[in-house]
Design a protein with these regions (language model features):
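Residue cluster at the C-terminal edge of the helix-turn-helix DNA-binding motif
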Residues: 41, 58-61, 120
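Short, cationic-aromatic polyanion-contact patches
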Residues: 10, 34, 70-85
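Extreme N-terminal segment that seeds HTH/winged-HTH DNA-binding domains in transcriptional regulators
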Residues: 1-31, 37, 87, 91-123
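Beta-hairpin "wing" of winged helix-turn-helix
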Residues: 25-26, 30, 58-67, 71-74
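A short alpha-helical element within helix-turn-helix/winged-helix DNA-binding domains
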Residues: 31-42, 56
Length: 124
């Protein structure tokens, strides 16, 4: 994982975990790597990983079973999706609309491009 200098590492780790949950790589109820395992694999201090896990725990995305480890919480996908939708709509989407207006791009243009994107497969 390559880290962005402009965003705290613990938040980047939390984002990566959320992406794994959203894509189904880590399904709800599954055990995730321990703080130590994650720290070793990412080559970061375990305290940084612990901060990520604490953040995600406080949001109800993961939970700790004492002595066993951390697990993806039931409903985690919905929590993540709702949080990311809100962030997208209040931030990124406003910027997209602003650029569309400046560049003269219509909703119909975007709709057409979106349907082409979906029909080709969104994984490209």
């Amino acid at each position: 994982m390559e880290f962005d200098q402009h965003k705290p590492i613990y938040l980047q780790i939390a984002d990566a975990i959320c992406e794994r949950i959203l894509t189904g790589l880590w399904p709800e109820g599954e055990r995730i790597p321990s703080v130590r395992e994650c720290g070793i694999s990412l080559e970061v201090n375990p305290n940084t990983v612990a901060r990520s896990y604490d953040e995600l725990s406080s949001e109800g995305i993961i939970h700790n079973k004492r002595g066993i480890g951390y697990f993806v919480s039931p409903g985690a996908k919905n929590v993540i999706r709702d949080k990311q939708r809100e962030s997208f709509v209040s931030g990124d989407l406003k910027e997209v609309f602003r650029k569309m207006e400046i560049l003269g791009i219509s909703i119909e243009d975007i709709s057409s491009l979106y349907h082409k994107y979906i029909s080709k497969g969104s994984k490209e």
